[in-house]
Regions:
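Acidic, metal-dependent phosphodiester-chemistry machinery of nucleic-acid enzymes
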Residues: 1-418, 425, 429, 433, ...
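Short, well-ordered alpha-helical segments
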Residues: 417, 421, 425, 429, ...
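Nucleic-acid endo/exonuclease domains
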Residues: 421-427, 431, 439-441, 450
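Short phosphate-binding/catalytic loops that engage adenosine nucleotides
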Residues: 436
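Active-site metal-binding core of divalent-cation-utilizing nuclease and nuclease-like domains
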Residues: 440-470
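Short, solvent-exposed loop/turn segments at secondary-structure junctions
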Residues: 445-446, 480-481, 537-539
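Active-site beta-strand-loop-beta-strand hairpin of nuclease catalytic cores
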Residues: 466-485
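Catalytic cores of nucleic-acid endonucleases
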Residues: 479-535
Length: 568
């Protein structure tokens, strides 16, 4: 492909501006303030990590909100059990910050922000991975090649203060990802001003990061307080600061954070070799390209580039990207195009989405890692190995949990049959240590009544039933697709309420026909306990929702539940 000279000149100019601004130092300072309560400064060639009494980012964010509330006359108000009013209140502040961000973004060259934001997100993913591996004891700082002195100091501090960092790490990393994804999304949908455009510098980036941090934090607070995690949704604003009046606020989030850390360490990675090929085949049929194309494609870096030339961002014109895809995956051109199109980030057209959690965005950089930029009418794609690897993991996760809309129909049955049954069998392995009277996938029963054989079928299949201490346990297993975000908490609670209602309906039929189960096991039943069991820990456990007598637990805690029952 022959590239016009003016395109090459603008491309060179764009990358020259990019290389003249190093955002990594600004970013890692902001990151350190959240994670370690440390400020990173350079003095006389040395790196100084200074403890800070208050979270600098939090205070700056608070000041942004205070200024907005003061202008709008909302600095001192009280909202009591009015969900609608709380949503209106938060959305008014979110709208103002969004408009401030759009006004700021519009004066910059769009390609400049996209290139810098894209590369920084790639850098962020590398840093996050290093932090997680160090915290889990699978990596030490001295084994990481190519660290500069700032990164080395930060990671060393994390390595030596694991207990301090570990509790809050997932919330901080999640917010960090949300901020940079939000920046890219808002930049793509914000038109440039027709007047003279500027290049984003370090100070500009800090402004954008802090304001998006504030916006993401407000969306999170709104989602939390209006979900059903808390008994009351009373809120007071005093001198611009929010006070939530609910005794569960700190208890639930602290307990959840600690348990999540425990289970994250102890729960093995998911692996379903018997089913993954079936799911991938259906993926290919639905979307027109091989699931493994992206993983094969990333070998281009090893095959084409010497180690010293590897970088966080590669720009490719689409024709060349298609050629690389066909060469490294062995697929045909039309399949390469479908792969590229599927993983290409698109602008968000629904502006109301910017009032929602990043989880709800249809197009997110971490899922759609190919970012197109326009130069003189030509499309150039930004490509990053860390982002591609991250997208592969997300796509795999969504495939296993049947969250890819195009694949849902064909993949529902194999997922239900194999993946869910894997959890059922795990539960049965625990139960058999406490009773011989248990049954998996219970629906059809054959009993003998007065020496006559009788068959009975319940309307719904029960995942596991067991009799322990003359108590019938009705266990429903749910391999929940959980997300550790406020929006994720809301979705988890909505799903849990649905499951609780289903179990409550089933209980009526079970109670009416309890004699069938007693005769089947030849054991008296004096009580019935319904149990909703999730594969991992969940925010639902300690929330004040009406559980209708259903015990909610996890696979991790189930054996303790059984031991308690045995001791009654």
């Amino acid at each position: 492909m022959s590239i016009p000279k003016n395109v090459l000149l603008e491309l060179a100019e764009t990358f020259e501006k990019f290389n003249s601004c190093n955002l990594n130092d600004v970013y890692i300072n902001l990151f350190s303030q959240q994670l370690l309560n440390l400020s990173v400064t350079k003095e006389h060639g040395a790196i100084i990590l200074s403890p800070i009494n208050d979270d600098i980012i939090y205070n700056k964010s608070l000041n942004i909100v205070k200024e907005i509330l003061e202008i709008k006359g909302l600095s001192n108000i009280k909202i009591i059990n009015q969900k609608k009013d709380i949503i209106i209140f938060f959305n008014e502040i979110i709208k103002t910050i969004k408009e401030m961000l759009e006004g700021k973004i519009a004066v910059f060259h769009k390609n400049d922000i996209l290139l810098k934001g894209f590369t920084l997100t790639s850098y962020m993913l590398q840093l996050h991975q290093q932090v997680q591996l160090i915290l889990h004891g699978r990596l030490t700082t001295y084994k990481i090649e190519g660290l500069d002195i700032v990164e080395s100091n930060i990671l060393n501090f994390i390595e030596n203060n694991k207990s301090k960092v570990n509790k809050d790490i997932n919330g901080i990393l999640g917010k960090d990802k949300a901020i940079l994804q939000y920046l890219i999304a808002l930049t793509m949908s914000t038109p440039e001003y027709d007047t003279h455009l500027h290049t984003m510098n370090e100070k500009d980036f800090e402004y954008l990061y802090l304001h998006i941090y504030t916006l993401v934090d407000l969306i999170s607070k709104r989602e939390l307080i209006t979900s059903k995690i808390f008994e009351e949704i009373n809120m007071t604003v005093t001198d611009g600061e929010f006070i939530f009046h609910d005794k569960n606020w700190a208890n639930i989030l602290n307990e959840f954070g600690e348990t999540f850390v425990d289970e994250r360490i102890s729960t093995p990675n998911e692996g379903f070799p018997n089913i993954i090929n079936v799911l991938k085949k259906n993926f290919h049929k639905a979307l027109g390209f091989n699931f493994d194309n992206l993983e094969k494609f990333i070998t281009f870096e090893e095959n084409l580039l010497p180690k010293q030339e590897k970088q966080l961002c590669y720009p490719f014109f689409k024709d060349y990207l298609i050629t690389l895809m066909t060469e490294h995956t062995g697929c045909k051109k039309d399949e390469a195009i479908k792969t590229i199109d599927y993983y290409t980030l698109q602008p968000i057209t629904d502006k109301d989405l910017y009032f929602e959690s990043i989880d709800k965005f249809e197009y997110r950089l971490l899922e759609k890692p190919l970012v197109p930029i326009q130069i003189k009418g030509h499309i150039l794609y930004l490509v990053s190995i860390p982002l591609l690897l991250n997208a592969i993991n997300i796509t795999y996760h969504k495939l296993i949990y049947n969250l890819i809309p195009e694949c849902k129909k064909d993949n529902s049955k194999p997922i239900q049959k194999i993946i869910k049954n894997d959890l059922v069998l795990n539960v049965a392995d625990i139960i058999k240590n406490y009773t011989v009277n248990y049954l998996c996938n219970a629906k059809d029963f054959t009993i003998y009544d007065n020496e006559k054989q009788k068959k009975f079928s319940f309307t719904s299949e029960m995942d596991v039933i067991a009799i322990v201490n003359k108590t019938l346990l009705i266990i429903e297993c749910k391999d929940l697709q959980y997300k550790y975000t406020p929006f994720g908490y809301r979705k988890d609670i909505q799903k849990a309420l649905k499951y609780i209602n289903e179990i409550s309906s089933e209980m009526l039929e079970i109670k009416d026909n309890i004699n069938i189960i007693q005769k089947y096991f030849n054991e008296e039943i004096k009580a019935i306990i319904p149990i909703l069991l999730f594969k991992t820990h969940n925010i639902v456990y300690n929330s004040p929702i009406d559980k209708k007598g259903v015990i909610i637990t996890s696979l991790h805690k189930f054996e303790n539940n059984l031991k308690s029952l045995m001791n009654q």
